[in-house]
Amino acid sequence: MRNVPVVARGDQFVFGQNLEDVAEFVGLQGGTGHTPLPPEQLIGKWLNVLRTAQRYLRQMPDARLNELVIDNRPRSIRLMGHHVFRIGEAYLETAVDGVEYATQLANVPPKDGTFTTGEEIARYGDTVIARLEKWWKELPDKSCQQKVKTFFGMQPLHLLYERSTWHSAQHTRQLAAVLERFNITPDKPLTKEDLAGLPLPERLWE
């Protein structure tokens, strides 16, 4: 069963993944009030986030990669680091290959015995960054209004693009918090300006 938020009213419902759909469903005039960043700004922010995650992972002690990110979540630092970049790969599978986007698509874990060092995970990031750069350079319609198939219906590519960007950013913020817990100062941390315009959760561990 998919773990997906749903807003229901009688026998009607809407998936909670698209907050504008939710706002319309409940009759909120003017929607959420959030204006997504233009696609040409998102690519720069996303690539900066991924490069920041690479720096953080290269700082992470390899001997601690299998520790939990936080005590009450069953995800190791290794899996979190891999996930930051897997989000980008999953996005491309939908945007380029036409695979239906689903939550589990971005949660495909690395095989046992792989990605055992921060450096190895960071190098995986190199391949994802290169693919994203190539995708953007070759994208014919940079408005990103073309529709893609997701588990919550056909959606504009722009929505999934923005979602994937802030999703990577949120986990990168969490990696910085892990470094700080280890008394390691994050290398060139993300700034408020880097994250401006992204609809990030208010709390770090949401």
How would you label these PLM feature ranges?
Residues 66-111, 147-206:
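Short, contiguous alpha-helical
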Residues 21-24, 28-91:
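Non-globular targeting/processing and membrane-anchoring segments
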Residues 3, 8-33:
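Non-catalytic, surface beta->alpha helical segment in thiol-disulfide oxidoreductase systems
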